[in-house]
Design a protein with these regions (language model features):
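ABC transporter nucleotide-binding domains
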Residues: 2, 9-189, 194-200, 204-208, ...
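ABC ATPase nucleotide-binding domains
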Residues: 219-256
Length: 256
């Protein structure tokens, strides 16, 4: 479903993504991990057609990302970390606009919206009576997730999808993406909540300084380095262990 070949992005003299190559088949949930500034968001923006790579290429569902950008966008869903929406619209107006942009018949779009309203336990009155700018962070997140899945895309990218969701909504969301994967959809899941990634993802890709540094099943990668947990493996590979030690030493200065 996703094939990246030597994907590279430069911003002036800064090399943000350094010749990344990987293949992701259908039906797989892949945790896309890295510390802040590693190039995760830049890579996701390239794969979703928001920015063009400086070098390299990628295909989504067999379509060339650069040559067939519009068709690629029709086949993907994307939940960005920022969760940007049109704040001057109600939730229902926004979702109906998204449905129209994807060419979904009005009745079909309204039915899909109702299904997501039920799944996320949203209030239909809230979707119709309040502007998105007045929504809570969690409510807005649910609307953005609904918009990303409304056209039933075969490939979905999530960037920090649990941000703002309460515990019950987060549990439901994790069950949702596992169901989507069983239906053959490709899920790319970027998050800093590593215990969730370890439980939900079939595979993790870890990048640092724009380069791929690990790729495999979470349990296998953890076992190979005798790390115990994915979080510990991540800190060892990305220099977080040194930061953790500095934090522990700093905390000791407060002890009587």
């Amino acid at each position: 479903m996703i094939s990246a070949q030597q994907l590279t992005k430069r911003f002036g003299a800064q090399l943000a993504v350094d010749h990344l190559s990987f293949e992701i088949p259908g039906g797989q949930i892949v945790g896309f991990l890295g510390p802040n500034g590693a190039g995760k968001s830049t890579t996701l923006k390239m794969l979703t057609g928001m920015i063009e790579p400086t070098e390299g290429t990628a295909t989504i569902c067999g379509l060339d990302l650069l040559r067939d950008t519009l068709e690629v966008k029709r086949r993907i869903g994307f939940v960005p970390e920022s969760g940007a929406v049109f704040e001057s619209l109600t939730g229902l107006e926004y979702l109906e606009m998204v449905g129209a942009l994807y060419g979904i018949p009005e009745a079909a779009a309204r039915e899909r919206i109702r299904q997501f309203i039920a799944f996320f336990e949203l209030s239909f009155e809230t979707l119709t009576d309040k502007l998105l700018g007045a929504y809570s962070k969690g409510m807005r997140r649910k609307v953005v997730i609904t918009a990303a899945l409304l056209h039933n895309p075969p490939v979905v990218f999530f960037d920090e999808p649990l941000d703002g969701l309460d515990a019950n909504a987060a549990v439901g969301f994790k069950a949702l993406i596992q169901t989507l994967a069983r239906e053959g959809k490709t899920i790319v899941y970027s998050s800093h909540i590593l215990d969730v990634v370890e439980r939900v993802c079939d595979r993790v890709i870890i990048i640092d300084k724009g380069k791929l540094i690990a790729d495999g099943r979470p349990d296998q990668l953890v076992a190979e380095r005798n790390a115990g947990t994915l979080e510990r493996l991540f800190t060892e590979l990305t220099g977080g262990a040194e930061l953790q030690q500095r934090a522990e030493n700093f905390a000791k200065t407060f002890r009587p």
